Amino acid sequence: MKKIVGHLIVLSLLCLINVNPARAWDAERRQPQSYELQQKYIHSFRQNAGFIHTERNDSIALLGDSLTTVLDSIGKYDEYFELKRVVIRSHILRGESRIAVAQSDMMYSKAQAMNHKFGMAMSLSAIGEVYSHMNRLEEAGTSLEEALKQLKDPSDNQILTKILLMQLVDNLLHLKNIGKAKLYIERINEYLSEDLSPVEQALFYNYNAYYCIQAGMPDEADNYLKEAWKLEPMLPVGIIRHLLIAEAAYYESKEEFEKALD
């Protein structure tokens, strides 16, 4: 009996000794998985020029906080703020406006305390989008313009710069502010096609078309839409929806209402 008890004690001690290595191994095993998820979400945001419709996936909202906590703890602040931006967008798309407002405010406070310009730009971009979804378009425009100013050297953050320019044009066209929209359209048109992804090209054509429709130039709008549709095989469904809406607006401007409804 004593021998059995002795063996059990030894086995128990061995199990206790091996708990920490097992936990460490599990943490090491999961770290690459966390990194892959972070990169997946950020890559999707960048490649789709901020117009991500797959972000309704619960995984982003559910895992986002834990992933950003990891980035914060290891001091990867550029990645932290960019991923936080993606998480806030996912909450907006899920209809969780209160969560999006709270997180964007906290994000801005953190970036401001750190004097982290990229983080402040990302935060203001998120705040601008929250305002847009709440139909507070004037406040949205102010936040987006301030976000653009925070980029010390826009050439270092071309992807975010392009996203902000498109957000601003979209905002100004909704406000029917054609004159100001034209200024940002001109900045958009400075980019060369070879420096743009297919999604970026399509969206640039799309916003040029919208501008031309509002400026009373339907034929030019039609030309931009035709160029955008050439990229259709390379575009995700969400971007194609944007083109369909622009096309409907074009037909409406031509008073071809049956085509607009198709």
PLM regions and their residue ranges:
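Bacterial N-terminal signal peptides
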Residues: 8-16
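Positively charged n-region of N-terminal signal peptides that target proteins for export
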Residues: 1-6
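Short helix-onset patch at the extreme N-terminus, typifying the N->h transition
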Residues: 7-8, 90
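A "functional boundary" signal
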Residues: 21-262
